[in-house]
């Protein structure tokens, strides 16, 4: 946005964090009056964030230790680009722990839409009440709980213990 001589909103990250890339591009185009096609905006956004995913993004503390102890089917539900997520997970040596990556773009729903979580349940072939969602964003926690998922709020994976898992965030 700054490269277009526009001042980004202070909370722009929060605004677009639950949107698909397509939704983000439309928002940016309309809100900042950008005279480019959405496809071009998406391309520029991906170029901007790809280095971060490829070289800088890290796991939350304790995540690798946590996931290595559980033999369950795991999927990632994310608003990020699937290829960028795969690059990061591969670099961090945890890609093999996941069966699938469900993106907002793949299901054409944002993470603030209950259908996003229901699509993840379909991939897992499980009912929402039989799935535990680990989430760090409050708005996502509320949406997932509303459609019957058990949710555990995560800020640091080292904080998880057996009681937390058994309670499933109730």
Feature annotation, model-predicted:
Residues 1, 20-35, 88, 120-121:
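Helix-loop "lid/cap" segments that line or gate small-molecule binding pockets
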Residues 1-14, 146-147:
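Active-site neighborhood of HAD-like aspartate-dependent phosphohydrolases
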Residues 14, 74-77, 133-134:
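Conserved SAM-binding loop
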